[in-house]
Regions:
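Extended charged
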Residues: 1-12, 30-32, 57-58, 62-75, ...
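Active-site phosphate/pyrophosphate- and oxyanion-stabilizing loops and adjacent acidic/basic residues
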Residues: 15
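Short metal-coordination and nucleic-acid-contact micro-motifs, chiefly zinc-binding Cys/His arrays
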Residues: 18-23, 70-74
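The −1 position to Zn-ligating cysteines in a subset of zinc-ribbon hairpins
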Residues: 23-24, 38, 77
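Short, charged/polar surface micro-motifs in flexible loops or helix N-caps
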Residues: 33-34, 45, 49-50, 84
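Histidine-centered catalytic micro-motifs used for acid/base chemistry in nuclease
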Residues: 38-44
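Charged, often glycine-rich, active-site loop that binds/positions anionic groups
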Residues: 48-59
Length: 138
């Protein structure tokens, strides 16, 4: 596969990705239907153009040997998680979620008020995605 060329993911590979976490989004753990699943690249394709310089060469090599679309680089994702992760790798996505949640709890008047009235409870996120909890339990 040439660098920058996006090769469609086969139905068989999509099924393997879906089965990886038994029909759950690898990030939030929500149950998803096969037709709703989006296939996320752990190391984003966009890193070849927009990512950190040290990752760009790694992604170019992944295009050459086609490992960019290998099962080890693919995760089942719900639409919301795939959209929110965007072109981030796992660590940047994790940090983005943590900082957004912390910011919302500190800065949003509505959130603080809802917490004050017991409408919502703040439980600090352990920073682990669904797939990481699954790997720990297996």
């Amino acid at each position: 596969m040439k660098y920058g060329e996006r090769k469609p993911i086969s139905k068989a590979m999509r099924q393997q990705v879906y089965d990886k976490y038994h029909g759950h989004c690898a990030y939030c753990g929500r149950k998803i239907e096969m037709k709703e699943m989006q296939v996320d690249h752990i190391i984003p394709i966009a890193y070849s153009c927009y990512g950190p310089r040290d990752k760009a060469e790694e992604v170019r090599k992944m295009f050459e040997d086609e490992s960019i679309n290998a099962i080890g680089n693919l995760m089942p994702a719900c639409r919301a998680c795939n959209f929110y992760k965007g072109i981030n790798d796992i660590e940047r996505f994790r940090n983005r979620i943590k900082s957004e949640l912390d910011h919302t709890c500190r800065q949003s008047f509505q959130t603080r008020l809802a917490m004050q009235y017991g409408i919502i409870k703040y439980e600090p996120w352990d920073g682990k995605f669904y797939f990481e909890h699954q790997q720990e339990n297996s």
